Amino acid sequence: MLTIALPKGRIGEDSLALFEKIFDTKFEFGKRKLILEAGGFRFMKVRNQDVPTYVYHQAADLGIVGLDVLEEKRLDIMRLLDLGFGRCDICIGIKAEESLDFSKPSYKVATKMENITRDFFSKKAIPVEIIKLYGSIELAPLVGLADMIVDIVETGETMRQNGLKPALKIMESSAFLIANKNSFYQKKAQILHLREQMSKVLYGS
């Protein structure tokens, strides 16, 4: 049996829909249930940011999670397949009336994604102070906490509603199938077969 960590929310729902299409079986978590055993799989419903942790520690053989989370977590796990759904961008956001300007000596940047943010500005040789927040990131520039934010953008509507605008895309993200390295070698045939089935449904190959 393969154990698969799925994030709560849209990516998790899209993942189960993909499994239903592949195996012609209903995969549905019971009310308030965090574990689902069906069709020869054990699915675990966890927080988005925790999926790589469950996979890294082999509490799950496989996981499905956004590339942004993988880039931020930086754990030693295998990326097997870009699933193509759950697409979003990681963008710098600024006040709607401002222009993006990197001429100041340094900047304050509010974000949940410290590593992605630090890497981007480091490569540009732009000095920044990163302010780690856990929610309501859009508020930071409006109250003078930060000059700009780095956040996930799907349509940009949340930023616009809060007087901000996406000014620069840092990276694109979509859902990836990931594997624990030990699990991959112990269950290689099973995992590769599943990857092939998923790829066939998604991409026809």
Swiss-Prot record:
Give the reaction(s) catalysed.
1-(5-phospho-beta-D-ribosyl)-ATP + diphosphate = 5-phospho-alpha-D-ribose 1-diphosphate + ATP
Gene3D superfamilies of this UniProt entry? Periplasmic binding protein-like II
Compartment list = Cytoplasm
**Would you identify the family this protein belongs to, as annotated?**
Belongs to the ATP phosphoribosyltransferase family. Short subfamily.
What the protein does comes down to:
Catalyzes the condensation of ATP and 5-phosphoribose 1-diphosphate to form N'-(5'-phosphoribosyl)-ATP (PR-ATP). Has a crucial role in the pathway because the rate of histidine biosynthesis seems to be controlled primarily by regulation of HisG enzymatic activity.
Q: What does its UniProt record remark on the domains?
A: Lacks the C-terminal regulatory region which is replaced by HisZ.
Protein name from the UniProt record: ATP phosphoribosyltransferase
What gene name does this entry carry? hisG
